[in-house]
Curated annotation (Swiss-Prot):
GO terms for cellular component: chloroplast thylakoid membrane; photosystem II. The chain crosses the membrane at residues 6-26. PSII is composed of 1 copy each of membrane proteins PsbA, PsbB, PsbC, PsbD, PsbE, PsbF, PsbH, PsbI, PsbJ, PsbK, PsbL, PsbM, PsbT, PsbX, PsbY, PsbZ, Psb30/Ycf12, peripheral proteins of the oxygen-evolving complex and a large number of cofactors. It forms dimeric complexes. This is Photosystem II reaction center protein Psb30. GO terms for biological process: photosynthesis.
């Protein structure tokens, strides 16, 4: 039996951890190009 709630929490946590640096990188990249 698969526990979808745990998988969902792990996926959302991973997305947050990956999205944080990604957003900062994109913002810095855009400011640098402008």
């Amino acid at each position: 039996m698969v526990n979808w709630q745990v998988i969902g929490q792990l996926l959302s946590a991973t997305l947050i951890v990956l999205a944080g640096p990604a957003v900062i990188f994109v913002l810095a990249f855009k400011k640098g190009n402008l």
